[in-house]
Swiss-Prot record:
GO molecular function: alanine-tRNA ligase activity; aminoacyl-tRNA deacylase activity; ATP binding; tRNA binding; zinc ion binding
Gene behind the chain: alaS
Subcellular locations according to the entry: Cytoplasm
Pfam families membership: DHHA1, tRNA-synt_2c, tRNA_SAD
UniProt similarity note: Belongs to the class-II aminoacyl-tRNA synthetase family.
Lineage of the species this protein comes from: Bacteria, Pseudomonadati, Bacteroidota, Cytophagia, Cytophagales
UniProt entry tagged with the keyword ATP-binding: yes
Protein name: Alanine--tRNA ligase
GO process annotations (BP): alanyl-tRNA aminoacylation
Sites where the protein binds Zn(2+): H563, H567, C667, H671
Length: 877
């Protein structure tokens, strides 16, 4: 049975049991601040469990893309090393929202595994929750009794809170669970060791394949548990492990889920899979990691240095390093796997196939970037290893590890991995200290304390009326206090609200809540777990009395101008650049619009003019808004409505159209009633955001007019300064050409002067052993001149160690130059020396082992630099 057949049989089975089959939610979690990625099938249904939303279907089944590489669920270190951990995996799941409970869930899981998939009954074990005295939770005897109907009692095992009480995080839905394990060992191995002793003991052939979670509780912020109003079933079955069991393989990687990619890598590397453990691990890492990388990018998250973007960059760099070190793949290669994966899963996850070229381009650019520093970084690690060996030490200190991270782009887990391969450890606490210090310097550290919700009225229905009204009378459903950077704020949920919550790139509304003669400012409106949350600094005096909601009309109007303009811009870009253009992100507020889109080259000035012209034509046409709500998603797609990759859409959507033949998008934001209200559209910048992603920033209405006026004023001033020439452009070109000639003459003069200075400094050489030391304090016109002097001396003086303390326009600068042979043979390091010397000028800097520079604030410290350098040279030499 192929993996595709196994997946389809699961969905067909639960469809026959009255379940609605729904698509996977995006792997990038945009609606839950507690999660960066979807790490379980239940994430998209969290609000059903909490009672925030009423499910349309009581029974649901799906296959969900999941990622577990951060926080509590972090399997990254094991991925590729063993045969069953993965970064990205599919979770098959069936759900009951206040419908069936333990009896049916247990019976159906047994029926599917034994009657449909034909797994041998004598190879299955189940676990149930044994209870927990500390939590005052009793044993799950219900589950035990239901299991007795299907399986021998000696195969029903008791599990502790760690294994058999499921929690998504520190807060949220939870409950006892019942796991199903399968024993895949040989008959001889089964006879030798009883399988029940290996359950939940990390045996690679005795593994959990299905978990039935019986959601009964909610974990509150104070750690206590409260009963949920309705009982639910949340099951999750690891698709890859299930395939291993059914296809009778010893490893997930031996199934047809992974073999197409492993075979592709093996062929490219010219190495047979199974020939060597190290190369096998590398191939498994690449086959696994490309799945996580591809789906995260396809669902809208690009690699970056922050949060979710950095998680995916870490995974990508881990894969590149394995390919580089163990498979001798020194050029970008990982991106070629995107096509293999996209073809394999086109029938179940079409979003990857439709973005195949874009995803591959992003991966390729990331590979190119990391490969530039990978070789240098690995050489640095080898140098560190040799230094530790000489000292008979085995720990890479935190400061050194942080330098590898900060300078060479090595994630901590990659440093730890390479260290382990060489019998070393990393001072993680020291690394964390360095990281914390950097965050403090960057003022990025922030703390947020959130209290539990206080219920005011028992009402879980929240209605947004802001498409039609900017004023409403509402009641508070619940509120909570939030402390951010020592400042108290409140979050309010109202039964009816005209305030638009920040989502889809559109900023949230501001305004006021009025009760009697008291006005409370609404500072922002956000969405969390599909709740519309109003942020204020105060609470109304009477929490149970109605409040009058009033949206800031001017802000909303300006924001609508910008949002509708992005729709026109999107359509115009497709018209000018091609159908490959897709939105990759946006920001619209009352001041500006920012639009990110897929395109592989800079948009030319001519193309930008065409785009502007089209948008302004559509504004002048004063096209009326055609808004349709509750359109069936399939109907909207047939009509050609543009949907955004990575967004989760329900069965019914809102469709925004400006001219049936021009712009039709799925959108939940607010818009102008007709395009004429936008007034005027002006692009202010076009730039690159990431590989294959461009960004346009623009203004509309009065802001656009002000921008054009300012440009006109600037042009008039330049014309006046140039003495009002007939041809301003020609005059500027002549002036720039003259400047180039003068600059060239100046550079030639400076080069000669630098050589003369270098020649005079040769006479000041001090011998320290076999090292020729030059230490000098100079006044130079530029940092480039300092560099020129240093390189001139390097070319003419052997065994050189040079320290320059230079006054550049009243600012202190330092340079350290060391001959290559001294770096290689004696381990001298200019970067390390510069860090010590820069303290004397209250500055900082860095560079390479042979040349490093620093700038600072304290000009009087240059004499101290020269004095201190003498002591440093004595120590290092």
């Amino acid at each position: 049975m192929t993996s595709a057949e196994i997946r389809q049989q699961f969905l067909d089975f639960f469809a026959s049991k009255g379940h609605q089959i729904v698509p996977s939610a995006p792997i990038v979690n945009k609606n839950d601040p507690t999660l960066m990625f979807t790490n379980a099938g239940m994430n998209q249904f969290k609000d059903y469990f909490l009672g925030n939303e009423t499910p349309k279907y009581r029974r649901i089944a799906d296959t969900q893309k999941c990622l577990r590489v951060s926080g509590k669920h972090n399997d990254l270190e094991e991925v590729g090393i063993d045969t069953y951990h993965h970064t990205m995996f599919e979770m098959l799941g069936n759900w009951s929202f206040g419908d069936y409970f333990k009896e049916e869930a247990i019976a159906w899981s047994w029926e599917l595994l034994t009657s449909v998939y034909k797994l041998p009954k004598d190879r299955l074990y189940v676990t149930i929750f044994e209870g927990d005295d500390k939590e005052k939770l009793a044993r799950d005897t219900e589950a035990y009794n239901f299991w007795k109907k299907w399986i021998a009692e000696d195969r029903i095992l008791l599990g502790n809170k760690k294994d058999n009480f499921w929690e998504m995080g520190e807060q949220g839905p939870c409950g006892p669970c019942s796991e199903i394990h399968v024993d895949l060992r040989t008959d001889e191995e089964v006879k030798a060791v009883d399988g029940k002793t290996l359950v939940n003991n990390d045996h690679p052939q005795v593994v959990e394949i299905w978990n039935n979670v019986f959601i009964q509780f909610n974990r509150k912020a104070d750690g206590s548990l409260e009963e949920l109003p309705d009982k639910h079933v949340d099951t999750g079955m690891g698709f890859e492990r299930l395939c291993m069991a059914i296809q009778k393989k010893k490893s997930n990687y031996d199934t047809d889920v992974f073999t197409p990619m492993i075979d592709f890598v093996a062929k490219a590397a010219g190495i047979k899979y199974g020939a060597d453990e190290k190369t096998d691990i590398a191939m498994r890492v690449m086959a696994d990691h490309i799945r996580a990388i591809s789906f995260v990018i396809a669902d809208g998250q690009l690699p970056s240095n922050n949060k979710a973007g950095y998680v995916i960059r870490r995974i990508l760099r881990r894969a590149v390093r394995y390919a580089y070190t163990f498979l001798n793949l020194k050029e970008p290669f990982l991106y070629k796997l995107v096509a293999v994966l996209a073809d394999q899963l086109a029938h179940v996850f079409p979003e990857l196939k439709s973005q195949q070229d874009f995803v591959a381009k992003v991966v390729q650019e990331e590979e190119i970037s990391f490969l530039r520093t990978l070789d240098i970084g690995l050489s640095k690690l080898e140098q560190i290893r040799e230094e530790l060996k000489a000292k008979k030490a085995t720990t890479i200190d935190g400061k050194t590890a942080f330098e590898l991270y900060d300078t060479f782009g090595f994630p901590l887990d990659l440093i730890q991995l390479i260290a382990r391969e060489n019998g070393l450890t990393v001072d993680e606490a020291g690394f964390d200290t360095e990281m914390a210090a950097q965050k403090q310097r960057s003022k990025k550290a922030a703390s947020v304390e959130t209290s539990d919700w206080t219920i005011v009225t028992e009402d879980d229905e929240v209605e947004f009326v802001g498409y039609d009204h900017l004023i409403s009378t509402s009641r508070i459903i619940k509120y909570r206090q939030v402390k951010t950077k020592g400042k108290d704020q409140y979050q309010l949920v109202l039964d009816t609200t005209p305030f638009y919550a920040e989502s889809g790139g559109q900023a949230g509304d501001t305004g006021t809540l009025v009760q009697g003669d008291k006005k409370i400012k609404v500072l922002n409106t956000v969405k969390e777990n599909n709740l519309i949350i109003h942020i204020t600094e105060q609470l109304p005096a009477d929490l149970k009395a109605p409040v009058d909601c009033k949206v800031n009309v001017l802000q909303r109007s300006l924001t609508e101008n910008n949002h509708s303009a992005t729709h026109l811009l999107h359509a115009a870009l497709k018209q000018v650049l091609g159908s490959h253009v897709n939105q990759k992100g946006s920001l619209v507020n009352e001041s500006v619009l920012r639009f990110d889109f897929s395109h592989f080259s800079k948009v030319t000035e001519e193309e930008l003019k065409k785009v502007e012209l089209i948008v302004n034509e559509k504004i002048r046409e004063n096209i009326s808004l055609n808004e349709r709500r509750n359109v069936p998603i399939e109907e909207a797609k047939k009509l050609g409505a543009m949907a955004l990759f990575g967004e989760k859409y329900g069965e019914y959507v809102r469709m925004i159209t400006f001219d049936d033949s021009f712009s039709r998008e799925l959108c939940g934001g607010t818009h102008v009633s007709s395009t004429g209200k936008i007034g005027f559209f002006k692009i202010t910048s076009e730039s690159s955001v990431a590989a294959g992603v461009r960004r346009i920033e623009a203004l509309t209405a009065t802001a656009a007019e002000v921008f054009v006026d300012e440009q006109q004023t600037t042009l008039a001033k330049i014309t006046e300064l140039m003495k009002n020439p007939k041809d301003l452009v020609k005059s500027l070109e002549d002036l720039l050409e003259e400047r180039i000639v003068l600059q060239k003459q100046l550079d030639e003069y400076q080069a000669e002067k630098s050589k003369a200075i270098a020649k005079s400094l040769k006479d000041t050489v001090e011998k320290v052993g076999d090292i020729n030391v030059i230490r000098a304090k100079l006044v130079l016109p530029s940092v480039d001149a300092m560099r020129q002097v240093a390189y001139d001396l390097k070319q003419t003086v052997d065994n050189l160690l040079l320290v320059l303390a230079v006054n550049v326009d009243g600012k202190p600068n330092i340079a350290v130059m060391i001959s290559d042979n001294l770096v290689a043979d004696k381990g001298l390091n200019a970067s390390q020396m510069i860090r010590e010397l820069s303290k004397e000028i209250q500055g900082g800097g860095g560079g390479q082992p042979f040349y490093a520079t620093a700038g600072g604030k304290e000009l009087n410290g240059l004499d101290k630099v020269i004095a201190k350098s003498k002591d440093l040279i004595q120590v290092h030499a």
